[in-house]
Amino acid sequence: MVQGDIADCINASATEVGVFGHGYTYSGHPLGCAVASKVIDIYQRDNIFEHADSVGEYLQTRLQALADHPLIGEVSGLGMIGAVELVADKASKKPFDGMKVGQFCAKAAEENGLIVRPLGGNRVAVCPPLIIENEHVDELIDKLSAALNVTLDWVRAEKLV
């Protein structure tokens, strides 16, 4: 462990101030804990969890409506997190090779003002903020649908389907 001059320096400082001050930002630091405690208070005061539960159900319903899109093999999600799996063949759910289709779709969404996350297996995930409203979910789904259509045109042009 710590010895010699380093230990002497730490001991001298701790003796002078009356405490051995230690810790890390992400391991119980008082300031980080105070912020986290206040955030929890705000979440409870503003009913953020109940709101997210309600809007999350709406998000999942709207995401499921995308299941008929020719590129989507599966829609998955829970609450305020959702994803669509992009497949080369809807009937067999044959995947695309690599991640380029998911990455293209994410770029198309971004160009339309929507940030999504491309995942492995050509999945595209959405994870909106907990304070989103139903009308924002509608906008999110409209923009994702537009990105899926642009992606479909691209995979056809590239002869990936």
What are these regions (language model features)?
Residues M1-V161:
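Conserved N-terminal phosphate-binding loop of PLP-dependent enzymes in the Aspartate aminotransferase
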